[in-house]
Structure formats: C-alpha cells, structure tokens
C-alpha cells in the first residue's frame, strides 16, 4: 500500500498536480490513486486514502479518516462512517444474491471505525428491509460474507470465512468463530460467542457460548462478560437465569415464568426474556 502513495508523492515532486477530490483542493491529506475511479456523485471526506484500481460508485459517502485499499469496490447507495479501513479486494454494497431482487433502491450503511479485511463481501438490502447495516467498531475478518438485510450491532467480530444468510441480526459485542455459518433470519444475541466451524440455524440468546453440531448452549460467556466489565453479581444473575431455562427440565413457558418469579429484576434478565419470547426460529 505504501508504494501506492509513493506514486502520488513522486508526481508532486515532478511538479505535476496531485490527484485530489473536488472540494479538497487545499487539503492534500485526501489522496486518490490515479488508477482509482470515483463517480462525481460520490462524497469523500477529508484525510481519506483510496488505493489503486478501487471503484467508488455514485451516491456513496465515505467519512473522514478512512483508508480504502486496492481493488476495492464500493457500490451505489453505500455510506461508510469515519475512521474505517477497508482492505484489498473487498466488495461493499453490491446487489444482493436474492432472486427476488428487482433493482429496487436499497442501501448499505457502515458505522465508524469498522475494519473490513481482505475479500469481504457485504450486499445491500432488499425491499423487505431496505438496508444492510453494520455498526461501529466492528471487525470483519478475511473472506467473511454479510448478506442482504443483515443488521450487525457495534463491536461485532466475524472471524475468517464466517458467513451470514439474509436478514440475520447480530447483537453488540457478539463474536463468530472462523467458518461459522448463520442461517437466514437467525438472531444472535449480544455478547454471544459461537465456536468456530459450527452452524447457527436457530436463535442464540444473549451472553452465552454456543458450540457443537447442532449448536447447543455451552454455558455463559464469562470471559467475554468480564472483559466488558460485568460485575460478579451481574454474571451470577445471568448464570442463574440460564440455569433455569436450559437445565431445569421445564418447558419454555414454564421456564420463563420461573425466571420471572425467581430471578431479581435486572435489565439483563429482561433482555434474555424478551429475546426468547420474540424468537421466531426457536432457541438453540
């Protein structure tokens, strides 16, 4: 990547004009490689670097302080927040792999400080939801795929080769191990850790570990919750809640009633109950 910027610096040394985006004539911090193609209808922020052979289509917005690598394609109606990094050969906002898609106007939105590594694909939404959303401070490792209409919260990590079907929802701070496959319309709760190589075909409630085939509850994500600053009392309450739901032998309704009566009031208790009750695909 450094050599790309050397090409621009070299051209300046030869007294030729640096390649600057309109509106940044007095700000040489925004550098666009001569081989990159940027539509005039795109909006590019300050201190942005755009690498060789990358393409930015119309109606794209790239926030300040972003670095876009070489051979990246950012398709129409995509918004990328500030401080993001997109590594080489990634495709952001391409049309969905959905046979029902009829070129309706939909979009892709990515928050601030999110990192998208090599060969990642993110598809735009369909008319069902209209948008694919990725939050702030996320990390999408190499060769991951985010399908149409997915919604990812903040601080989500998708490890190498993990794949989301359409309409998947992932809560804040969730982590998917390498090669995880998530079935369309599945919901992954906040602070969940799914072990590498497994499939999620049913909803995974917040704060837990999931592994095995088929995916099963493996306990509370204690290490993750410690790192996020959950107190001993909060972690104990979450463990007691799931002990009733998964280990008591009660059916779903009876387990939820027992949780409501036996577990002290807590936003985490309410979050678990609301997630389970709203599940449409069933709980692992």
Regions found by a protein language model. Give the residues of each.
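Terminal amphipathic alpha-helical/low-complexity segments used for targeting or macromolecular assembly
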Residues: 1-35, 40-41, 46-47, 83, ...
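Structural signal for interior beta-strand "rungs" in well-ordered beta-sheet cores
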Residues: 31-211, 216
């Amino acid at each position: 990547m450094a050599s790309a910027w050397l090409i621009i610096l070299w051209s300046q040394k030869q007294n030729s004009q640096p390649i600057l985006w309109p509106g940044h004539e007095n700000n040489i911090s925004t550098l666009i490689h001569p081989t990159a193609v940027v539509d005039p209808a795109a909006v590019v922020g300050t201190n942005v670097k755009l690498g060789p052979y990358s393409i930015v289509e119309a109606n794209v917005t790239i926030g300040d302080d972003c670095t876009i690598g070489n051979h990246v394609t950012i398709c129409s109606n995509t918004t990328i927040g500030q401080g993001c990094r997109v590594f080489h050969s990634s495709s952001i906002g391409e049309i969905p792999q959905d046979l029902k898609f009829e070129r309706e106007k939909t979009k892709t939105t990515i928050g601030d400080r999110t990192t998208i590594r090599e060969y990642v694909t993110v598809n735009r939404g369909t008319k069902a939801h209209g948008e694919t959303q990725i939050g702030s401070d996320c990390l999408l490792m190499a060769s991951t795929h985010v399908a149409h209409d997915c919604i990812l919260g903040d601080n989500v990590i998708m490890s190498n080769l993990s794949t989301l079907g359409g309409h998947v929802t992932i809560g804040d701070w969730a982590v998917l191990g390498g090669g995880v496959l998530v079935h369309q319309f599945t919901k992954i709760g906040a602070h969940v850790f799914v072990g590498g190589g497994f499939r999620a075909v049913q909803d995974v409630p917040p704060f837990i570990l999931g592994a095995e085939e088929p995916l099963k509850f493996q306990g509370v994500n204690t290490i993750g919750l410690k790192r996020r600053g959950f107190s001993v009392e909060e972690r104990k309450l979450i463990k007691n809640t799931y002990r009733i739901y998964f280990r008591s032998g009660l059916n779903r309704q009876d387990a939820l009633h027992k949780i409501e009566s036996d577990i002290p009031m807590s936003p985490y208790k309410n979050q678990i109950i609301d997630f389970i009750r709203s599940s449409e695909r069933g709980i692992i």
